[in-house]
Each structure stands twice: as C-alpha cells, then as structure tokens.
Swiss-Prot record:
InterPro entries referenced in this protein's UniProt entry, alphabetically: Cryptic/Cripto_CFC-dom, EGF-like_dom
UniProt gene name: CFC1
Phylogenetic lineage: Eukaryota, Metazoa, Chordata, Craniata, Vertebrata
Signal peptide: 1-25
Main location group: membrane
One record GO biological process: anterior/posterior pattern specification
Biological role: May play a role in mesoderm and/or neural patterning during gastrulation.
Organism expressing this protein natively: Gallus gallus (Chicken)
Gene Ontology CC annotations of this record: cell surface; extracellular region; plasma membrane; side of membrane
Protein name stated in the entry: Cryptic protein
Source species, domain of life: Eukaryota
Annotated glycosylation sites: N38, N60
C-alpha cells in the first residue's frame, strides 16, 4: 500500500514535468518566431527607398530587353492567378500540392494526386511470393531473388502473388500500444487507491 503512494507521486511528478517541459518548448519556439519575424521586418524595411525603386526599374528594363531579344522562346503565363481558389490539399500520401491541381510525389508514390504506390498494394518492406520467386517491395520497386525458392514451380502462374507478412513494423506498433495501455492502467489503478 505504501509503495503505491510512491508510484502515484512519481507518476504525477513525471506528468507535471513533461507538461512544463513541453510548455517551455512552445514558449521558446514562439520567442524564436517573433525574433525571426522582427529581424525579417527590419531587413525588409526600406532604408533608402530611391535605391530600391532604382533597382526594380533596372531589373524591369533588363527583363524587357531580354524579352524583346528572345520573344519567340517565351510563352506568357495564363494560368491560375487567384490564390484563394487554389486547392492546397489536393495531394495524398505526403505529396506537395502545386497550383492546386498537380502534385510533387514522395519517392514511393506516383499518380496525379500521389494515390498510386509503385509496388501496387504491397507495402514497403513486405516479402511476397511471385510465382516461384521470393520478392520484396523496396523503395517503390519489387525486387526478386534470382534463385527459384520452390520445387515444381513450373505449374504455378507467374502473376500469382502470395503475401509473406513481415512482423517488424507491426511489432513496433504493438509494443507502443501495449506501453500506452500499461501506463493508462497503472495510472487508473494508482488513482483509485
């Protein structure tokens, strides 16, 4: 009974310490953001407005002269001009939305909205049997071992894929869930006593 009070106190102190630590981290981030914003505002404040205007006019003049020299090579942009109408959530699986309609996809995905996995329905790192060969989806491509893994494979079809599930990622997820559940139950038991 006496040790349960110590566990309860230790657990409470740990939670309070984490809350304080996270709060300080957010305050530091906010201070950094404010400092960066102030620094940027000071850098962008016009110290000599005549110099800035002259620089812009020089840039425009040089652009106009280049445009006239190579007018055949340039196509005017007639695309979307109002940023309010752009769909900023057009991509899936962590893709970057470009102009509200196109996506720059991460390594293992493709398609207009990053909806297609390059290995199909096979998750990165999983082993599968494709015909007579043992294959693994690595970085978006299905890599197969060069040797035949079974006898009498000539009778099987090449397109047949049998999944061999790897337990590595699932084991990590299960352990995390069990630790969270154990922590919750320990807290519940300690508070009821």
């Amino acid at each position: 009974m006496f040790w349960r009070k110590h566990v309860r106190i230790l657990f409470t102190v740990t939670l309070i310490w984490q809350a304080i630590h996270l709060g300080k981290g957010r305050e530091k981030e906010h201070e950094k953001d404010v400092k960066n914003f102030n620094d940027t505002a000071q850098k962008q404040s016009p110290k000599n407005s005549v110099t800035i205007i002259d620089a812009f006019s020089d840039m425009n003049q040089s652009y106009q002269s280049r445009k006239q020299q190579n007018s055949r090579e340039f196509v005017p942009f007639t695309g979307i001009t109002e940023s309010k109408n752009l769909n900023r959530n057009c991509c899936q699986n962590g893709g970057t939305c470009i102009l509200g309609a196109f996506c720059a996809c991460p390594k293992h995905f493709s398609g207009r909205h990053c909806e297609l996995r390059k290995c199909g329905s096979i998750i990165h790192g999983d082993w599968v049997m494709k015909g007579c060969w043992l294959c693994r989806c690595l970085y978006g491509t299905l890599k197969c071992l060069s040797q035949n893994t079974q006898d009498g494979c000539e009778l099987r079809r090449e397109e047949e894929i049998i999944r061999l599930y790897s337990n590595g990622l699932r084991l990590q997820q299960t352990m995390s869930a069990l630790i969270c559940l154990l922590t919750f139950l320990l807290e519940l038991c300690c508070w009821q006593l």
